[in-house]
Every structure is written in C-alpha cells, then in structure tokens.
UniProtKB/Swiss-Prot annotation:
Single Gene Ontology MF annotation: structural constituent of chromatin
Listed name of the protein: Histone H1-like protein HC2
Stated family: Belongs to the histone H1/H5 family. HCT subfamily.
InterPro entries, alphabetized: HC2
Gene encoding the protein: hctB
Organism of this sequence: Chlamydia pneumoniae (Chlamydophila pneumoniae)
C-alpha cells in the first residue's frame, strides 16, 4: 500500500509540471489585450479641452478680487508714512548722543598712553647697564651685549635664562 501511494504522488507532480507552462502562455495573451484597451482610454483625453474652458471663467473671478486688494494698500500707505516720519526723527537724536560718547573715548586713551610710558622706562632700566636715562630710541643699543657695561651692576641675563635656552636648542 505504501508503495502504491508513492507512485500516485509521483504521477500528480508530473502532470502539474506540464500544466503550468500552459497557464503562463494564456496569461501573456491577456496582457496583450490590455494594451489594446489603453488606446481607448486615450480618447477621453480630448474631452479635457472642455474643462480648460471652465478654467478661463475662473480667471475673471480672480480679477474682481484683485480690485478689492488694490483699494486696501492705499489706506495703509497713508498711515505708514506718518509713522515713519516720527521714527526717523527719534533715530537722529539717538545718533547724536552716541557721537558725544565717542568724543570722550579718545581722551581716556590718551591718559592710558601717558601711564604706560613710565612703566616702560622702569622695566627697561633693569636691562640697561649704561649711566643714562633709558628711552625707547636707545633700547636696541643698550640691550645689545657689545655695548653693555659689566662690573658694578649684577648680571641680569644668566646662562639658564629662557633666551639662552632657545639659543642652545637652535645651535644643536
């Protein structure tokens, strides 16, 4: 019994394999008929021209709306001009107050420059070994090693200073 059942199942699969390609060919033929129907759908596209005529009627309705909008800005322009004139007058007064503060600032800068000059002379006097007042004009001459006087004052620059450390690193 078991052997007979296996033979029957084998016959069914063989018959199904033969029937499947026949169904696929029939399906392809139906698709070709659908392409013929698409040409019939293109004919109602000519009727859409009648719908375009109704669109032209809508433009006439829009023209009436534009006339009402044109009347509104004429009223707004009169109110806007009055407000602009008042604000411009206020802005000019504000700019005048700012210019007065700018004139005061250079006076404060002059005082800072005067304070900085004695600080530079005091700091440079330590590096100067000559018996005269150190100024910015003689800074290069006094700081050079060739014209420096040794003896009375202690040596300011040492071999372990950061300048000498850079010179040693560059020479290596």
């Amino acid at each position: 019994m078991i052997g007979a059942q296996k033979k029957q199942s084998g016959k069914k699969t063989a018959s199904r394999a033969v029937r499947k390609p026949a169904k696929k060919v029939a399906a392809k033929r139906t698709v070709k008929k659908a392409t013929v129907r698409k040409t019939a759908v293109k004919k109602p596209a000519v009727r859409k021209t009648a719908a375009k005529k109704t669109v032209a009627k809508k433009t006439t309705a829009k023209r009436t709306v534009r006339k009402t909008v044109a009347k509104k800005p004429a009223v707004k322009k009169v109110a806007a001009k009055r407000v602009v004139k008042k604000t411009v007058a206020k802005k000019t007064t504000a700019k005048r107050a700012v210019r007065k503060t700018v004139a005061k600032k250079p006076v404060a800068r002059k005082t800072t420059v005067a304070k900085g000059s004695p600080k530079k002379a005091a700091a440079c006097a330590l590096a100067c070994h000559k018996n005269h007042k150190h100024t910015s004009s003689c800074k290069r001459v006094c700081s050079s090693t060739a014209t420096r006087k040794h003896g009375s004052k202690s040596r300011v620059r040492t071999a372990h200073g950061w300048r000498h450390q850079l010179i040693k690193m560059m020479s290596r």
